[in-house]
Amino acid sequence: MKKKQIAILGSTGSIGTQALRVIEEHSELYEVYCITANNKVEELAAQARKFKPAAVVIANEQRYDRLKALLADEPDIKIYAGAKALDEIVEAGPIDMVLTAMVGFAGLSPTIHAIKARKTICLANKETLVVAGQLICELAAQYRMPILPVDSEHSAIFQCLAGEGDNKVEKILLTASGGPFRNFTMEQLAAVTKADALRHPTWDMGAKITIDSATMMNKGFEVIEAKWLFGVDADKIEVLVHPQSIVHSAVQFCDGAVKAQLGVPDMRMPIQYAFSYPDRLHITSERLDLFSHPLEFFKPDTEKFRCLGLAFEAIRKGGNMPCIVNAANEIVNRGFLEDRCGFLQMSDVIEKTMSRVAFDPNPTYDTYVATDEEARRVAAGLIDSRG
């Protein structure tokens, strides 16, 4: 049986490293064709030595020489650098699936190229759908290529919808851990530090998504992602704070029945399901013990966690507004990680950026690129002026 050839965009990040573990556990089924990273050359080189891909790409061209030196004794591995190389590598003939595990707006262009090259997309880069959901879904339909969700919540919804055909969805119940500051007062939130925010209670994630989880912007982005993946309006998507992260999400149908997907918090499960769909494969992991897990659900506090409300506002407005929010969020997230922006200031800067960047109700790809640049500039200026 021919092994599926997989390209992992962002192999040194949290999702990428766990995807490599899945491939290693099922090496009889999957093979790594290509791995990519932005800056982490040492990690990328170590992965290349272990998995022997046909190619590696380092997005930061300044790290190319270092990567070349690290892999000097691996002549069979082709080494490329730059954003253009990312777009080109996903088009390589042997690739069957592309896992988009890179962070941020940078995931949009290679995803578009992969769809046009008729590759199955395993989508972990939520910003792609946040920024350009309509464009991506239209392309996927045009080229008849599936987009398989890797986010645990969207994988859960996808699994709940399996076998339901045209049965009408009444509501999507999107669960959120609530982050580490769920019970904080506004005064406590104002004093939150980077170190506080990077300690997530239930999931092991990269720095950017951990901060987004703490502000609940991550959940806002997942609402937008769900709208596009499942064709459900935002007003039919309800966010439930579920601190245990056992119920990964649920779907309520027109007869009132609710289907939920449960499991221990382990990102290998949704990654593996995207790789193996529609089949399920064994995974060596902890099993869910419902006797030791109480299940609690709460309404999110959108006054304390304003980013969630701003994301709903953006998707209702449509056009390039979600792109504006995403760009501003990338800037404030980095600003917070660099101690240049306070925890509560993040939502203030995003809100002001939303009102200051030109709105376009019918954006093209070029509009998204221009909007992204403008929103980043505006948000950065607001941080510098203490927006």
Regions found by a protein language model. Give the residues of each.
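Catalytic, metal-anchored helix/loop core of enzyme active sites in primary metabolism
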Residues: M1-G387
